[in-house]
Structures are given as structure tokens and as C-alpha cells.
Amino acid sequence: MKVLLINGSPHEKGCTYTALSLIAGELNAAGIETEILNVGTKPVGGCIGCGGCAAGKGCVFGGVVNGAIEKAKTADAFVFGTPVHYASASGNMTSFMDRLAYAGGRYLAYKPAAICCSARRAGTTSTLDQLVKYPEFFHMPLVSGSYWPMVHGSNPEQVLQDAEGCAVMQELGRNMAWLLRCIEAGKAAGIQHPENPRRPMTNFIR
């Protein structure tokens, strides 16, 4: 089994990475492979609604999004992490998630997901509210802990001083490992995820 962790921070080894590493550490301890994918510092343009991804060949703009889609095909679960920028996910992470969802949502469906964010001080809850919208759109079981998944600090050393936040990250890793094993056991017993029909599309204004 493998979990793909997305680092939406422009700092490759910063606070968000520290939080994701705590999650990955617990997954690794349970015998689950992990990979942290950095969205990076190059600008990630937003989705323009062109519909080109409907052909099933990824996003027409390519880049880190299509690289993530390829990795998503073989991943069993995901963790989406971001720093807090003006009480929301980073700009690159927002564009990345929008395009990943539109062009690669079929590879996210029914796979467990966790979210987390890192901030110096505030804006965490609104950021988590933003991130949770993506797994809720694709039938993804949401992995939680004993508190909202956030850490605080201006640098990795300070994040590690946030004992409660770090403990919650570790809970996410352990709980995700448990859920993945449950899903694996279910498959071995012949239990598959439901095949839901395509939902009807209705507009608020006819």
C-alpha cells in the first residue's frame, strides 16, 4: 500500500513538510509506503474550465498536476497539506487542487484522504474548511484525529514544539493505516466500494 502526501507549501522542507513527515512516519511504521510530492515554487495556473481534461489525458496545461495524476493512479490514499496564506490554502495549492480534482478525480474516488495545514497564528479553520471540500466531492473516506488537523509555528523547530498539533498529525497517520488495513481486509472478504450511479445535475435557476 502507498500513500501520496501533497505539500502545498513553496518551502520544500518547511512547516507543512514537517507536519506531513509526522503523518508519514506513522504510516511507515505500519509498513505503508509514502511519498511526499511538492507542488513547488513555479506558478500553478488555475483551471480555466476549458473541458480539455474530459478526454481523459490529464490537464491540458500539464506540469506538476499531471505528474500528481500519474502518481494518484497507483496511490491507495492521500494527505493534502498546505500552509495558511490569508486564511486559506496557498495560491499554488488552490490551483493545484482545482485542476487535480477536475482532471484526475476518477483516481481519487473511494480512496481515504486526510488534510492538514500549518500556520504561524490564525486562519487554520477556514483553510481546513476549504481543503475538506475536495475529498467530500469524490466519495473519499475522511481520516480524522482527536482535534482539527493543524500545527503552529514559524519554522520546523517551532512546529515540533506544538506538542498537541504534532500528536494529532501522528494520530492521522495511525488512523489512516488502520483504515487502509480495514479496506484491504474488506476486499479480501469480497467487499467492494458501492458503484454509485451518476448523480442528476440540477441548476438553481432553470
How would you label these PLM feature ranges?
Residues I32-K42:
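A short beta-strand-loop structural module common to alpha/beta enzyme folds
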Residues K2-A30:
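N-terminal beta1-alpha1 ligand-phosphate binding loop
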Residues K42-A72, P200-R206:
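Cysteine-cluster motifs in flexible loop/terminal segments that predominantly coordinate metals
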Residues G25-I32, A77, A101-G105, E136-M140, ...:
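Generic secondary-structure signature for well-ordered alpha-helical cores
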Residues P141-R206:
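Glycine-rich phosphate/pyrophosphate-binding loop and the adjoining helix
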Residues A55, V60-Y147:
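Helix-loop-strand module that forms the ligand-binding subsite of alpha/beta enzymes
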